[in-house]
């Protein structure tokens, strides 16, 4: 499947220019495809993260009629059994980073994990959607740092004194959940290229 995509344009489904910028930065110059951002209105699916990613990717591929890459991000609070999870976008819109921090006010456990799933489709509905997952563990803290990237101000990765928002982009992009997922996507393409996609 990867070999059939090499050299082709893949539509990365996002309306967020910052996200495209970060993805291109992480993938670097050696990624064998061209990513082009396109905002597509997809239904808000419910369910487990993998199910949501597959449904979104299939629908995006149907609309684009070609190869697509869809990203889904979850922020999961362990004290809340994994919530907000895939619904983080809506929680963030209503509560802002301060409100996310407040959600855990009554809990000792402030641990959380950020999960990023990239779903890739060739655009052919008979081919399976491939999933590439990355996860980073951390703590939910009082928001600190720049406010230009979602919930970054209240997520402090384990082993670091800074929140995602306080870190230089170059550092964040070597440890983030998005980096880990994209690293798996890169590996998939390089293994497929090396093996002639057999």
Swiss-Prot record:
Residues with PTM N-acetylalanine: 2
Superkingdom, natural source: Eukaryota
Broadest EC class assigned to this enzyme: hydrolase
A GO BP entry: chromosome organization
One MF term in the entry's GO annotations: identical protein binding
Keyword Phosphoprotein attributed: yes
E.C. code: 3.6.1.66
Species, as recorded: Mus musculus (Mouse)
Gene giving rise to this polypeptide: Itpa
Residues the entry annotates as binding ITP: 14-19, 56, 72-73, 89, 149-152, 172, 177-178
Protein name as it appears in the record: Inosine triphosphate pyrophosphatase
Source species taxonomy: Eukaryota, Metazoa, Chordata, Craniata, Vertebrata
PANTHER family referenced in this protein's UniProt entry, alphabetically: INOSINE TRIPHOSPHATE PYROPHOSPHATASE, INOSINE TRIPHOSPHATE PYROPHOSPHATASE/HAM1 PROTEIN
Gene Ontology CC terms, in alphabetical order: cytosol; nucleoplasm
Reaction(s) catalysed by this chain's protein: ITP + H2O = IMP + diphosphate + H(+); dITP + H2O = dIMP + diphosphate + H(+); XTP + H2O = XMP + diphosphate + H(+); N(6)-hydroxy-dATP + H2O = N(6)-hydroxy-dAMP + diphosphate + H(+)
Role according to the record: Pyrophosphatase that hydrolyzes the non-canonical purine nucleotides inosine triphosphate (ITP), deoxyinosine triphosphate (dITP) as well as 2'-deoxy-N-6-hydroxylaminopurine triphosphate (dHAPTP) and xanthosine 5'-triphosphate (XTP) to their respective monophosphate derivatives. The enzyme does not distinguish between the deoxy- and ribose forms. Probably excludes non-canonical purines from RNA and DNA precursor pools, thus preventing their incorporation into RNA and DNA and avoiding chromosomal lesions.
Any Pfam family: Ham1p_like
Binding site for Mg(2+): 44
Disulfide bridge positions per record: none
Record text on subunit structure and interactions: Homodimer.
Family: Belongs to the HAM1 NTPase family.
